[in-house]
């Protein structure tokens, strides 16, 4: 660093470098040259970077400790190849174009009577709508499942149909995305979550708001953390997690979060 | 997707809207499932990479550049010239190209009389030698044209005059060859022939003219028809060059002289001032 700095900056006051250590530090300098050599020696002893050690006890106010880190490195064999990521980005782009193309058509479609979309502010309502009552309430009623063979979206959660997703405004998309990501922070990855996240990202319009950027980055970091804890490659969740990280990093230009082969 | 949409519209007419909605509503879900499944396929086999590599090499573009060279054709020599046409002709004396206008045409002989626009003299030329535009020819070709032009002009001079007049022409050409006899001959026939003694006097004046008054430019003849003499010969040009060099050298010398004179005056004044001061002290 010093050599670089010396080369870059012009020398305003040329002073010969002190090779010999004849001068003692205890005695005061007798002439200007000695003083300058003292200064040089002290400067060479200082480190380039100094980190202050803060004692938490002495802090008067309570401050929030935010430790923001990048995506955790994927275990060996878990990360997807670059070609696969490029394919997914191109297909995702095509899906987004198709959604935009047919948005007007699907907006005109009327929903069935059993489909009741919650309000934008209703976080619990949206969770129930997307994941179903079973996942939300963590109820495991195998007997009832056997009794009712037909599809009951109220309990299993509504899939992200185009007729439903097309009716969401950008603010609603952002809000629902936030609800799902907050839910994901505390719980495990479920298939319904993957489908809804994919659908919401497909509807999220560019350029993104700063809040949207923060949400998707949070999603990518959470996905990488979950992926790091997976036990084997054959886990069904690995593909979905890789897909989410790939879409956020490659398509939405968060390249610092991208997987490196 | 477009086909799917059309099918949906068609099915809707039949009243199967629920099924079609559900079928196409799941496009996003199917895309998601496809994406998730593709990762598993990528993990399983390495065979998938091979066809991609085959697809990678694209066709090389061939650059076929066609060089079309355009050949410029000179004016056709078979052009029919008419009286009053503008053209370019080589003067027989120096072989240079000058702008001219045709004053008379003789189709039988293939010759014509041209009036040089910039100089005012006339000359007989072959119709085939005239040019519509000044060509961009090499020096060798130009020299060749000059030689041909000289030969043709000599033949013309021999043919164009009667035996008596030709005799006079020969005599005059011998005495006044350096002055440009071909330019004088065409103008003689139209005017009436003067008496012998008067003619001799004119000849004498011509002999006297070039010497004392104008070394390189003979004077115009007041009695005869007006004519512009040929351009000056080489020796006066050389003299002029020497004069230019001499004047340049003289100006250099004079500037040095003036500088020295000024320096001398200045030094003299200084010495005078010094002597006065020393005298006072």
Swiss-Prot record, chain B:
The modification Phosphothreonine is found at residue 14. Keywords: Cell projection, Cytoplasm, mRNA processing, mRNA splicing, Neurogenesis, Nucleus, Phosphoprotein, RNA-binding, Spliceosome. Its main location: nucleus. Residues 225-252 are annotated as: P2 (binding site for SNRPB). Residues 145-159 have a biased composition (Basic and acidic residues). The keyword Nucleus applies. InterPro entries: Smn1 (IPR040424), SMN_C (IPR047313), SMN_G2-BD (IPR049481), SMN_Tudor (IPR010304), Tudor (IPR002999), Tudor_SMN_eumet (IPR047298). Disruption phenotype: Decreased axonal branches and decreased dendrites in motor neurons. Decreased GAP43 mRNA levels. Morpholino knockdown of the protein causes severe defects in motor neuron axonal outgrowth, including truncations and abnormal branching. GO terms for molecular function: RNA binding. Residues 1-20, 42-77, 145-242 are annotated as: Disordered. Residues 179-197, 212-235 have a biased composition (Pro residues). Pfam families: SMN_G2-BD, SMN_Tudor, SMN_YG-box. Residues 80-140 form the Tudor domain. Residues 59-73 have a biased composition (Basic residues). CDD domains: SMN_C, SMN_N, Tudor_SMN. GO terms for biological process: axon arborization; axon development; axon extension; axonogenesis; dendrite development; motor neuron axon guidance; mRNA splicing, via spliceosome; neuromast regeneration. The modification Phosphoserine is found at residues 17, 20. PANTHER family: SURVIVAL MOTOR NEURON PROTEIN, SURVIVAL MOTOR NEURON-LIKE PROTEIN 1. The SMN complex plays an essential role in spliceosomal snRNP assembly in the cytoplasm and is required for pre-mRNA splicing in the nucleus. It may also play a role in the metabolism of snoRNPs. Required in motor neurons and proprioceptive neurons to ensure correct U12 intron splicing and proper levels of tmem41b mRNA. Required for the maturation of motor neuron axonal branches and dendrites. Homodimer. Component of an import snRNP complex composed of kpnb1, rnut1, smn1 and znf259. Part of the core SMN complex that contains smn1, gemin2/sip1, ddx20/gemin3, gemin4, gemin5, gemin6, gemin7, gemin8 and strap/unrip. Interacts with ddx20, fbl, nola1, rnut1, syncrip and with several spliceosomal snRNP core Sm proteins, including snrpb, snrpd1, snrpd2, snrpd3, snrpe and ilf3. Interacts with elavl4. Belongs to the SMN family. The Tudor domain mediates association with dimethylarginines, which are common in snRNP proteins. This is Survival motor neuron protein 1. It comes from Danio rerio (Zebrafish). The gene is smn1.
